[in-house]
From Swiss-Prot:
One of its GO terms (cellular component) is cytosol. PANTHER family: TRANSCRIPTION TERMINATION FACTOR NUSA (PTHR22648), TRANSCRIPTION TERMINATION_ANTITERMINATION PROTEIN NUSA (PTHR22648:SF0). One of its GO terms (biological process) is transcription antitermination. The lineage of its organism: Archaea, Methanobacteriati, Methanobacteriota, Methanomada group, Methanococci. InterPro entries: KH_dom, KH_dom-like_a/b, KH_dom_NusA-like, KH_sf_prok-type, NusA_arc, NusA_bac. It comes from Methanocaldococcus jannaschii (strain ATCC 43067 / DSM 2661 / JAL-1 / JCM 10045 / NBRC 100440) (Methanococcus jannaschii). The keyword Zinc does not apply. Residues 149-183 are annotated as: Disordered. Residues 156-183 have a biased composition (Basic and acidic residues). Participates in transcription termination. This is Probable transcription termination protein NusA. One of its GO terms (molecular function) is RNA binding.
Amino acid sequence: MAKVRLTTEEIMKIGFFEKIANVPILDCVLNDERVAFIVKEGDVGAAIGKGGENVKTAEEKFGKKVDIIEYSDDWRKFIRNIFAPIQLDDVWVKRVGKDVVAFIKINPKVRRAVFGEKGKNLERALKILKRHTKITKIKVIVENQKFKRKRAKRPVVKDQQQEQTETKQETDVQQDVKETVKE
């Protein structure tokens, strides 16, 4: 885990949220539209507050959406928590060369939510992961649910001469079968 350097704005937001939620905040990550607070495992409910009271108060104060993310030592679980409530099909972490890469397998229906506008959700997730784990990259695998149609072996449109030839061949085979049965 890298040392986390906080800006003055992040420190102020952490101080405010800790005061209203009465929960220790591990980290704060900001972008243009959102503020994400990382809390210890098991502290999510207390951080959110009854009926989302703490989150609503913070959103009014900051003028931005507030996300509460539960930290976990299990990197796969932590990744799922970062993207919650989006359902990820599978998550695994693998060393690729010098990089530690998080692979996320998703359904095409949630692709837009995972990436976010101009990839902002992925950028935020990677920033959080770099600060709290050794993960350096995220690769998203979108399940392909569309099946490619195979090319027809024969042309779909037949000309009359081909149809007559095939019909004659079928008739000849049927007559051969009848003659064999009679014998």
